[in-house]
Amino acid sequence: MDITRDDIDAAARRIAGDVRRTPLLRIAGRELGVDCAELWLKLEHLQVSGSFKARGMFNRMRADVVPAAGVVIASGGNAGIAVAYAARALGVRAEVFVPASSSEAKRARLAQLGAVVTVRGASYADALAASLDRQATTGALLMHAYDQREVVAGAGTLAAEVEADAGVPDRALVSVGGGGLIAGVCAWFAGRSRIEALEPALAPTLAAALGAGCPVDVDVAGIAADSLGARRIGDIAWSLARRHVAASHLLADDAIRAAQLALWHGLRLAVEPAAALPLAALATRAVVPRPDEKVLLVICGANVDVATLA
């Protein structure tokens, strides 16, 4: 299931006109209280649709023929929003299945982007089963939030941009839910950068898989569950992460929240909890870089109510 740098280069060409080349903010570590030479913040919260997910969703749609039935996905979070955004931009129909537990605000945003929003079941698993049934019935192109080759290759394009802008970081800190993001980063930087996974303690998909020796279901809760709410690490991510991720760190909700507020008060970056995990790992000293290191923090999304950052 390897994704190659050639796959990522092809994805970058495919989606160049659809997504933003987001800024890479380079600051001294001391600006955020970290003892390292430089922090490189890849600002994917400024990406179209509000997260890195747009890269993979555009790549999936551009790489395949989208049938008249359009596309279908199960997601109440950033992936669904990215699919709705990409489908509208490309003029295709999108149906997003969400569980009853999804927020009204997210459903409203999906509808505002032009998606057909269908509520099915109490959990993501229920919504996923319904989306698979719909795909089988209609022939729509099935989109997955993180476990498709085109989606992972799309995510990897942000790592390619980092290297083009600044070189290869000594260390890359990446938030993990289903694993599409870290899979893309692994595919690009494997063997050249120390890649570390950051997970909420209440949603430890990769840590659980590493402990069990294979992907397993986990219970998901906590502050970052909206965007890191997968119950199991993806197969593609597992294939790459078990070989190329140096460590997985679990972070408490209070540390994630403190880092989210620090990014707002210190740099005026309004980001979702998932995007704050890299800084939380540094602030709690779960990750301790060498003083001469250049450390990449992937700021993955902006699915946040700014009123909560006051």
Language model feature labels by segment:
Residues M1-A310:
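PLP-dependent amino-acid enzyme catalytic core
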